């Protein structure tokens, strides 16, 4: 089992650092899946038990100048590692304006992901800063629990408003209630609602648009104004919104009525799926 990779392009390095910061905000620990052409950051808490799930995917060729890996075997050419997200994020913070970044799987009395950052000093000579991030290698028999989540057909799929705006609305609502209802329809309308014994607050977003597939065949006989809704823990939604550092190129919200909400974001060449289950 081997893995080594190198980034020398400054824009790629900054983008990779931003992704790492986002993951650290979304998950305390995560699984890093390394395959020949992709990297995935995975969080697979069981939705049925009220946990959130995350699947973040990036094509390695869009980031790395060098990328070599050998999986656990020829037929299972993948590596699954568990790590503390904050440790990776902290290591990459030192990589701003770096000349190069190297990541390597090592064993220093315990398995590590070793991050080496080549920095230019004032005298133009370079110095290397190294971080050893402790990891756990996940055995093959547990991989089946770490596959891409199956997305059920949504009742409504809708484009999200500007995430910054949505975040500031949800932050205010969190001061009133821990629970939130997200509802949306096929007419481009999305509402965020909280209800307590004393107060009921709703924020309306209109003309957001629905992706083409959502309006065709399966929904032809549906009333486009009919709302699908899901009742969720507001803190889980806020954690997701707080993790978004940049407004994505595409942001979709898929609602499975009274079961779950699935957010599907595309940041340039990085996709992020995030699942929040309904409160039982």
Curated annotation (Swiss-Prot):
Per its UniProt record, what InterPro entries does this chain match?
Cell_cycle_HUS1 (IPR016580), DNA_clamp_sf (IPR046938), Hus1/Mec3 (IPR007150)
> Which GO cellular component terms are attached?
checkpoint clamp complex; cytosol; nucleolus; nucleoplasm; nucleus; site of double-strand break
State the compartments where it is located: Nucleus; Cytoplasm, Cytosol
Under the heading SUPFAM superfamilies, the entry gives: DNA clamp
Looking up Gene3D superfamilies in the UniProt record yields: 3.70.10.10
Q: Which GO terms describe its biological process?
A: cellular response to ionizing radiation; DNA damage checkpoint signaling; DNA damage response; DNA repair; double-strand break repair via homologous recombination; embryo development ending in birth or egg hatching; meiotic DNA integrity checkpoint signaling; mitotic DNA replication checkpoint signaling
Source organism superkingdom = Eukaryota
**UniProt main location, coarse:** nucleus
Q: Which family does it belong to?
A: Belongs to the HUS1 family.
Oligomeric form and interacting partners = Component of the toroidal 9-1-1 (RAD9-RAD1-HUS1) complex, composed of RAD9A, RAD1 and HUS1. The 9-1-1 complex associates with LIG1, POLB, FEN1, RAD17, HDAC1, RPA1 and RPA2. The 9-1-1 complex associates with the RAD17-RFC complex. HUS1 interacts with POLB, HDAC1, FEN1, PCNA and RAD9B. HUS1 does not interact with RAD17. Interacts with DNAJC7.
Function of the molecule: Component of the 9-1-1 cell-cycle checkpoint response complex that plays a major role in DNA repair. The 9-1-1 complex is recruited to DNA lesion upon damage by the RAD17-replication factor C (RFC) clamp loader complex. Acts then as a sliding clamp platform on DNA for several proteins involved in long-patch base excision repair (LP-BER).
Its name, as the record gives it, is: Checkpoint protein HUS1
Which organism does this record belong to? Homo sapiens
């Amino acid at each position: 089992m081997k893995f080594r990779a190198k980034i020398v392009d400054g824009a790629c390095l900054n983008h990779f650092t931003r992704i790492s910061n986002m993951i650290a905000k979304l998950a305390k620990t995560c699984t890093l899946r390394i395959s020949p052409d992709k990297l995935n950051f995975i969080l697979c808490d069981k939705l049925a038990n009220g946990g959130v799930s995350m699947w973040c995917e990036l094509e390695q060729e869009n980031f790395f100048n060098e990328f070599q890996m050998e999986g656990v075997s020829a037929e299972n050419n993948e590596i699954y590692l568990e790590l503390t997200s904050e440790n990776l994020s902290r290591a990459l913070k030192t990589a701003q304006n770096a000349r190069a970044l190297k990541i390597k799987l090592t064993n220093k009395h315990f398995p590590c992901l070793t991050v080496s950052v080549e920095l230019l000093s004032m005298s133009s000579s370079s110095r290397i800063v190294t971080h050893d991030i402790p990891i756990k290698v996940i055995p093959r028999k547990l991989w089946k629990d770490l596959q891409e989540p199956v997305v059920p057909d949504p009742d409504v799929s809708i484009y999200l408003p500007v995430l910054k705006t949505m975040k500031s609305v949800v932050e205010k609502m969190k001061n009133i209630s821990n629970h939130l209802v997200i509802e949306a329809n096929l007419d481009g309308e999305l509402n965020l609602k909280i209800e307590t014994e004393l107060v009921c607050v709703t924020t309306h977003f209109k003309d957001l648009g629905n992706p083409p597939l959502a309006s065709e065949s399966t929904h032809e006989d549906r009333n486009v104004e009919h709302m699908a809704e899901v009742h969720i823990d507001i803190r889980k939604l806020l954690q997701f919104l707080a993790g978004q550092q940049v407004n994505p190129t595409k942001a979709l919200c898929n609602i499975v009525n009274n079961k779950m909400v699935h957010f599907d974001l595309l940041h340039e060449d990085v996709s992020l799926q995030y699942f929040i289950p309904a409160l039982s």
